[in-house]
Amino acid sequence: MDVTRLVLATLLVFLCFFAAYSHLPPEEKLRDDRSLRSNSSVNLLDLPSVSIVALNKKSKKISRKEAEKRRSSKKEASKQKVARPRTPLSVPCVSTRGSCKPPAPACCHPCASCQCRFFRSACSCRVLNVNC
């Protein structure tokens, strides 16, 4: 009994490995550049070349004042984006995550848009860009 179970278990494991590896594409061994060029779907000559530039010591060192100026300018730029005026809200509108089937009015949130699924049977207002 134990021998037959061992044989059946071995056969089952073999069949599992055979089923798994039969679906994988065979690996190709490339021996030289010629076979690489002929087998590749993308032509390597069409890709843009990458240039490596060495940095000198002056470009690596940034003074503390310059770094603070850059940080403050980035903060000011982000504050200017936040302070942008919003469009006035229309009175009949659909709230975010509310149903907005096509005869319904527009979404209340200025950055929201009506997205439909399942052949326009389920529609809801969604905010796509949080930073809007």
UniProtKB/Swiss-Prot annotation:
InterPro entries, per the entry: Agouti, Agouti_dom, Agouti_dom_sf
**Organism (species):** Cebuella pygmaea
Lineage at the top is: Eukaryota, Metazoa, Chordata, Craniata, Vertebrata
Q: In which compartments does the protein localize?
A: Secreted
The cross-references to Gene3D superfamilies, in alphabetical order and at most eight, read:
Agouti domain
Sequence intervals crossing the membrane: none
- One Pfam family this sequence matches: Agouti
User: What is this protein called in UniProt?
Assistant: Agouti-signaling protein
The keyword Repeat is annotated on this UniProt entry? no
Q: Domain named Agouti: which ranges?
A: 93-132
Tell me the keywords, alphabetical order: Disulfide bond, Glycoprotein, Knottin, Secreted, Signal
- For this UniProt entry, what is the primary localization, expressed as one broad class? secreted
